[in-house]
C-alpha cells in the first residue's frame, strides 16, 4: 500500500512475511531514515505533533426556548370605550341644557321688557287722565340787568344805555336812570366808573349806589367810595372805582348811581357800567 511521502516521521509499515517482493527480500523492513544510526553531525528530528482529536460529529441545533405566553389584557382596559362614550354623552347633554336655559332666559327677558313697556304706557296714560296736560307756562325770566355808559348823560343820577352793545335787561325794569326791582330777594349789585383827566386838580371823586323807595323818606346809600389825592398835580391821570355787594331788595325798590364829577367820566361800555342779578 502506498502512503503519502510528506507525512512526518516516523512511518510504520506492515510487512507480510508471506508476501514476496521483487526489490527486497522477504521479511526485510525499510526503517525510517531517521531511525537509523545517526552520525555525530546529525541532529535528532523534532518529536511528532500531538495527535489531533477527531472532530465531534455535527451537533443537533439547540432547541429554541419555549415562547412565554402573552398575558391576557386586563379586563378593566376594555372599559375605556364606554367611559369615553359616557363622558361625551354627558358633555352633549350639558351643552343642550345650557342652550335651553339661555333660550329660556332670553325669552323671559323679552317678556319682561314687553311688560315694562306696557306698564310705562299704562302709567303714562293714567297720569294723562288724572292730570290732563295744561299749556306749558312760561317760566319767569331770571332777574338780571347790565347797563353801560351813556355819553349823552348830562344829569345826576347817571343815565345808562339799556339796549345797544353789551347791555341787557330781564326780570327788572329800567326807568329814568334807575333799575326797578319786580321781585323780592337777594341780589348782587355792582357798579364801575372810570374817571380820567388831562390835568390833575385833586378834586374829590365820589361814587355811590343808593336806593329809593316810597317807604323811606330819604334815599338809602348802599355803597360808596370817595377818593382824595389820587393823582399828581398838573399831569394826565385816570382812576377806576368799583363797587359790589349783596343786598336783600324788595319789590318797587329803585337803584341809582351818583357821581361827583360828570365831566371826568369815560362812558365806554367796557369801563363804565351798572347792573345786578338775582341770586
From Swiss-Prot:
Annotated PROSITE patterns: THD_1, THD_2
Residue ranges, Cytoplasmic side: 1-78
Ranges per topology, Extracellular: 101-279
PTM per Swiss-Prot/TrEMBL: The soluble form derives from the membrane form by proteolytic processing. The membrane-bound form undergoes two successive intramembrane proteolytic cleavages. The first one is processed by ADAM10 producing an N-terminal fragment, which lacks the receptor-binding extracellular domain. This ADAM10-processed FasL (FAsL APL) remnant form is still membrane anchored and further processed by SPPL2A that liberates the FasL intracellular domain (FasL ICD). FasL shedding by ADAM10 is a prerequisite for subsequent intramembrane cleavage by SPPL2A in T-cells. Phosphorylated by FGR on tyrosine residues; this is required for ubiquitination and subsequent internalization.
Sugar attachment sites: 117, 182, 248, 258
SS bonds (residue pairs): 200-231
Keywords for the protein's UniProt record, in alphabetical order: Apoptosis, Cell membrane, Cytokine, Cytoplasmic vesicle, Disease variant, Disulfide bond, Glycoprotein, Lysosome, Membrane, Nucleus, Repressor, Secreted, Signal-anchor, Transcription, Transcription regulation, Transmembrane, Transmembrane helix, Ubl conjugation
Stretches with biased composition (Pro residues): 45-68
Entry GO terms, CC: caveola; cell surface; cytoplasmic vesicle lumen; external side of plasma membrane; extracellular exosome; lysosomal lumen; nucleus; perinuclear region of cytoplasm
Key word Lipid metabolism present: no
Record field: transmembrane: 79-100
Limits of the THD domain: 143-279
Region (Disordered): 30-70, 126-150
Tissue spec: Expressed in T-cells. Expressed in natural killer cells.
One GO process term, biological-process aspect: positive regulation of cell population proliferation
Gene Ontology MF term list: cytokine activity; death receptor binding; tumor necrosis factor receptor binding
Family: Belongs to the tumor necrosis factor family.
Function (record text): Cytokine that binds to TNFRSF6/FAS, a receptor that transduces the apoptotic signal into cells. Involved in cytotoxic T-cell-mediated apoptosis, natural killer cell-mediated apoptosis and in T-cell development. Initiates fratricidal/suicidal activation-induced cell death (AICD) in antigen-activated T-cells contributing to the termination of immune responses. TNFRSF6/FAS-mediated apoptosis also has a role in the induction of peripheral tolerance. Binds to TNFRSF6B/DcR3, a decoy receptor that blocks apoptosis.
Medical condition linked: A deficiency in this protein is the cause of generalized lymphoproliferation disease phenotype (gld). Gld mice present lymphadenopathy and autoantibody production. The phenotype is recessively inherited.
Description of how the protein assembles with itself and partners: Homotrimer. Interacts with ARHGAP9, BAIAP2L1, BTK, CACNB3, CACNB4, CRK, DLG2, DNMBP, DOCK4, EPS8L3, FGR, FYB1, FYN, HCK, ITK, ITSN2, KALRN, LYN, MACC1, MIA, MPP4, MYO15A, NCF1, NCK1, NCK2, NCKIPSD, OSTF1, PIK3R1, PSTPIP1, RIMBP3C, SAMSN1, SH3GL3, SH3PXD2B, SH3PXD2A, SH3RF2, SKAP2, SNX33, SNX9, SORBS3, SPTA1, SRC, SRGAP1, SRGAP2, SRGAP3, TEC, TJP3 and YES1.
Listed name of the protein: Tumor necrosis factor ligand superfamily member 6
Species for this entry: Mus musculus (Mouse)
Lineage: Eukaryota, Metazoa, Chordata, Craniata, Vertebrata
Amino acid at each position: 500500500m502506498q502512503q503519502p511521502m510528506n507525512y512526518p516521521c516516523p512511518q510504520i509499515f506492515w510487512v507480510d512475511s508471506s508476501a514476496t517482493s521483487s526489490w527486497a527480500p522477504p521479511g526485510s523492513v525499510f526503517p525510517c531514515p531517521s531511525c537509523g544510526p545517526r552520525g555525530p553531525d546529525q541532529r535528532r528530528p523534532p518529536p511528532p505533533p500531538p495527535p489531533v482529536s477527531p472532530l465531534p460529529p455535527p451537533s443537533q441545533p439547540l432547541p429554541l426556548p419555549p415562547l412565554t405566553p402573552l398575558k391576557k389584557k386586563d379586563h378593566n382596559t376594555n372599559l375605556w370605550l364606554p367611559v369615553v362614550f359616557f363622558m361625551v354623552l354627558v358633555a352633549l347633554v350639558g351643552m343642550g341644557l345650557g342652550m335651553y336655559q339661555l333660550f329660556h332666559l332670553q325669552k323671559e327677558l323679552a317678556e319682561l321688557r314687553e311688560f315694562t313697556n306696557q306698564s310705562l304706557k299704562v302709567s303714562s296714560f293714567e297720569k294723562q287722565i288724572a292730570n290732563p296736560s295744561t299749556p306749558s307756562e312760561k317760566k319767569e325770566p331770571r332777574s338780571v340787568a347790565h347797563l353801560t355808559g351813556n355819553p349823552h348823560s348830562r344829569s345826576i343820577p347817571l343815565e345808562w344805555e339799556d339796549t345797544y352793545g353789551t347791555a341787557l335787561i330781564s326780570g327788572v325794569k329800567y326807568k329814568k336812570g334807575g333799575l326797578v326791582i319786580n321781585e323780592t330777594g337777594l341780589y348782587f349789585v355792582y357798579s364801575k366808573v372810570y374817571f380820567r383827566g388831562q390835568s390833575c386838580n385833586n378834586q374829590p371823586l365820589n361814587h355811590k349806589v343808593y336806593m329809593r323807595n316810597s317807604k323811606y323818606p330819604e334815599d338809602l346809600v348802599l355803597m360808596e367810595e370817595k377818593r382824595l389825592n389820587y393823582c399828581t398835580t398838573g399831569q394826565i391821570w385816570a382812576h377806576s372805582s368799583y363797587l359790589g355787594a349783596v343786598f336783600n331788595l324788595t319789590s318797587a325798590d329803585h337803584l341809582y348811581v351818583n357821581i361827583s364829577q360828570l365831566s371826568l367820566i369815560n362812558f365806554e361800555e367796557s369801563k363804565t357800567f351798572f347792573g345786578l342779578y338775582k341770586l
